[in-house]
């Protein structure tokens, strides 16, 4: 009997250990290569390749519907490759939509979570709810900067790291808001978009201190992730794809910009808990909305509708 109980306990211990490991990833900023490799590991772990959008061994991935815990941790490493003390920052991310819920200072295991994620807990941490939410509108207002034109390099990430590690209390301060804007961009947004990954990664091997500057086009991608996620699964070789001001003329153009999309036909991805201004980054509320092919172009329905209406008015 004791042997049976021991085996059962061992089985559950192994399962629990596997689950814990599966929820933890490392994002290594030591070099451009380690950074991209780390992103690809996370993408492959949570996404499934779309065979219809694949070229030369690179595919667009869709987030798996998954089961169990919807959170995973991203441990930041290599901000300063020569200083081990810069290895105590952990970001807690929702799996089904890649929203960063907050950060953990691993020196004391305090989890500083945004106000809109006040219900979120993570094993082994003590939660503190910040006074502001995670919407880009709130973060930009508190930070006093705009995402368009925001500069990020190794030095600014080091400063951001130190700001987060020195934070205490519930106030969403300017320094914390700025730091989270930067880290969300080079983690969650870089996971979603190769265009952002590509723009930032080259700064990691640049000794001159050159910065990645977030462009209006980059910001536009991030605000249309939900619409892109709804439309791109319907791509089957059409001449181009149109979503708002975004246009892709080939598979390679899609793959060069987008890496990972939402699973818009799984209910958890369609729950919008962000502020109303953030809704464009979510899947359409109606999970049945799909892309529309018109004149060999794959359209987002609202984009096509707006264009056809303008043509009707002008005719």
UniProtKB/Swiss-Prot annotation:
Q: Where is the signal peptide?
A: 1-22
Which Pfam families does the annotation name? RIP
Q: Which GO terms describe its biological process?
A: negative regulation of translation; symbiont-mediated modulation of host virulence
> Does the record carry Signal as a key word?
yes
Q: Where is this region: A1?
A: 23-273
Top-level taxonomic group: Viruses
Q: Which InterPro entries match?
A: Ribosome-inact_prot_sf, Ribosome_inactivat_prot, Ribosome_inactivat_prot_CS, Ribosome_inactivat_prot_sub1, Ribosome_inactivat_prot_sub2, Shiga-like_toxin_subunit_A
Q: Which residue positions are annotated as catalytic?
A: 189
Q: Region annotation A2: residue ranges?
A: 274-315
Similarity comment text for this entry:
Belongs to the ribosome-inactivating protein family.
**Would you tell me the protein name for this molecule?**
Shiga-like toxin 1 subunit A
User: Which organism does this record belong to?
Assistant: Enterobacteria phage H19B (Bacteriophage H19B)
* Chain's gene name: stxA
